[in-house]
Amino acid sequence: MRKLLLSAVVVSLALGLAGCDDAKNKETNSAAAAKSDAPKEGGSLIIGITSGDPLAVNPLYASDRTTLTIMQALYAPLYSFNNGNIEWGLAESLTPSADNLSYTLTLKPNLKWQDGQPLTADDVVFTFNKLLDAKQHSFFRSMFTYGGKPVEVSKVDERTVKFTLPQVSAAFTGTLVQIYPIPQHVFAGEGDLEKSTKNDAPVGSGPFKFKEYRAGQYYALTRFDDYWNGKPKLDSVTYRFAKDSNAANLALQNGEINLKMVDPQDVNRLKNTGKFDFMVYPEGRLAYMTFNQNVAVMKSKALRQAIAYAINKDELTQTAFTSLDYAKPATSFLTPDTLYKTDDVEQYKFDLQKAKDLLKTSGAPDNLKLRLAYVNTNKTQESMALYIQQALKGIGVNVELMPLDSNAMSQRSLDMNNTAWELNLGGYIMGAEPDGYKSLFMSNEAYNYAHYKNPQFDALWDKGAVETDATKRADIYKQIQQTVTNEMTYYPIAYTNATVAVDKRFGGTKEAEPKPVYLFQDLSKIYQK
């Protein structure tokens, strides 16, 4: 018995020592792996872009995905929101007055533009004066106009700016988050900021500064060492333009690009390579179809409603996005992350007979033919377009598909007299503050792609912007959502998730904070392992 016990002890000690050796080996291996994955300075990140070249790389005008993505690296915001909490950027505080009719913004000390000039309160005041100037045609103007009167902006000292509101607005803080200052010393004296040649080589305050742009090829940036949030880890970031998703995916697999948004249809194939990490997150984005009321036939509410009833939205979403993991059928033009979003609106459940009955009363001619525009590099939009074409054939409406490149789509959409199509597919991300959506819906706004005009509807938007009682405000935005649905000015299709493939040789993506459209809040945190 004693011999057996001793043997047992010896075996236990041996196993214990072996375990220690295994543990040491694991610790050594883990330490080596951790060391290899640790953030390093240097290296280059190449981001694949399939949404076309940028337009005006200026924060007062950026509205398309490409321009917004590039702008986020070049310019810095005053602050941002993360899970509902303020994260300070160029600013360090924003203090409301006791009556909420003014706000005092304080900038961080020692801020610099990428050309070495100081960034001060003068730049913030200049930025606001320009966006409020009707001659500059910035879509932000309406967001800082309450009851027909603009916000007044004044300099207190080199780091302090005062905003004076014509009336109390619950929307102000949520709208100010969208503002990225532009440099006064660069743009002073420029007549038309959107068309200014100064946008060709931007001077910003973000983590990376402009190096070179070759149309149709790439947009190259280099590290800005005096960035307010610390020197970026990468030496450079380059946005490489691909003619379509297939070409970009091939470049991704070959290591020619390191990161890109991917279509749901491509995820499994890329996963099977084992080369990439994937980030899937809600975009706060609505995929939609617009009815262009510049074209006479689309002024018929009955026709717009007939089209809505002819589409099986659940089936459309499943077909276009391949899985409900990547999108959910939409119930309102407001996204789920937006304040006061409600499902208490007409949902237009698929009803072919009702669609046919409405079409008969719509005044539309027999053998109606409609043109449906979409971005030709967007696989999901192409799938949507094909589905809608077949769906409307079921009520006797012929649909001609109009695939366009991204820039052509954007430029035609901004034409207030556009009659190039009756229907078009698109998507937007507007944030948590519902007042931000009014630039898409009010009668004379440049981004009112539906060209729907209704003074009573405009008045609801004005009322919602200044109402401070949350219950009353919720009711106003409920009325707004019901109006959009009843009038069927926009057909909400799906709330989408973003899927981003990242080369496993890069880290810091979590710290960089994945963000809809922009890809990341702060590219300075990404590093090469």
Language-model features, listed with the residues they occupy:
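Surface-exposed binding/hinge segments that line
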Residues: T95, D99, S142-A188
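Ligand-site clamp/hinge motif
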Residues: F224-L270
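Alpha-helical secondary-structure segments
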Residues: I46, T120-F126, E158-T164, G206-P207, ...
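A structural "hinge/loop" feature
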Residues: T50-L68, L90-E92, Q117, F172-P181, ...
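Structural transition elements
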Residues: D325-T361, N378-Q381
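N-terminal lobe/hinge region of extracytoplasmic solute-binding protein
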Residues: G48-A98, N129, V203
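Detector for C-terminal structural segments
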Residues: I311-T338, T380-Q389, L414-K529
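Gly/Pro-rich hinge or "lid" segments in bacterial periplasmic/extracellular proteins
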Residues: V177-P232, S236, D357
